[in-house]
């Protein structure tokens, strides 16, 4: 294993922990500035990780639900740094109990979901509806449900599809490529490099085809494969 990549990983972990420890009290004492605190805090974090971001496409201001592929914490950092939209992230209940990061989720008033409790889906539906309709906060979900260990996307969980269809939402898919090279939590390495964020055309779910969700996973994986192939060809 490259020693420098391991050192960079621990540097990255320190930077993330430092910025998070600053954001936690700020979110608590200045709740009305929540969106700006998260936006600029993550923007500073991304800069200190020396990650260069290229974007393709544009975020849709109408989007109520963002569906993003998931490789690690850098996905969240990147989207928060790019979008000043007070995103409401859906995260499993266990993450709210993690030291530091759990406090960030709680003070950021994010949505927790208990996968082991059947009532968890009912709570999730209520929380999403309240977020979108009352707070006007778009919701962000990783449809895979957890981090992929490689560039192959995991099967999509049914929850995001159910939510989008129940509330007739406008969904914008987002593909993030390169986050694992910036911080690889599985291998505890960091090689730096470029991030590419691709905003796909929004999906008006009530007017979409019945297989829109399955097709979306296929389309997102195809984009990831194409980006990786282009990267290899440039080396």
Label each region the model flagged.
Residues 98-102, 122-124, 199:
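Short, charged, surface-exposed secondary-structure boundary motifs
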Residues 52, 88, 111, 138, ...:
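Residue-level detector of anion-binding/catalytic polar loops
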Residues 41, 75-78, 100, 159, ...:
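Hydrophobic alpha-helical segments typical of transmembrane helices
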Residues 55, 66, 89-90, 197-199:
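Generic preference for hydrophobic
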Residues 1-54, 103-107:
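A transmembrane-helix-recognition feature enriched in membrane-embedded lipid enzymes
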């Amino acid at each position: 294993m490259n020693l420098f990549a391991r050192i960079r990983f621990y540097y990255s972990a320190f930077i993330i922990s430092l910025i998070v420890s600053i954001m936690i009290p700020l979110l608590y004492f200045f709740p009305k500035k929540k969106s700006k605190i998260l936006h600029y805090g993550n923007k500073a974090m991304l800069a200190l990780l020396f990650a260069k971001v290229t974007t393709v496409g544009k975020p849709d201001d109408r989007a109520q639900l963002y569906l993003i592929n998931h490789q690690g914490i850098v996905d969240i950092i990147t989207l928060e740094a790019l979008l000043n939209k007070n995103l409401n992230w859906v995260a499993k209940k266990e993450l709210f109990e993690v030291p530091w990061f759990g406090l960030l989720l709680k003070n950021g008033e994010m949505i927790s979901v208990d996968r082991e409790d059947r009532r968890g889906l009912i709570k999730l539906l209520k929380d999403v509806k309240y977020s979108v309709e009352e707070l006007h906060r778009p919701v962000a979900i990783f449809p895979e449900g957890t981090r992929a260990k490689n560039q192959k996307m995991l099967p999509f969980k049914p929850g995001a599809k159910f939510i989008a269809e129940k509330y007739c939402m406008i969904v914008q898919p987002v593909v993030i490529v390169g986050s694992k090279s910036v911080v690889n939590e599985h291998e505890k390495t960091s090689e730096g490099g470029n991030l590419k964020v691709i905003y796909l055309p929004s999906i008006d779910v009530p007017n979409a085809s019945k297989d829109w969700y399955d097709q979306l996973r296929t389309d997102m994986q195809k984009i990831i494969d194409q980006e990786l192939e282009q990267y290899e060809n440039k080396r």
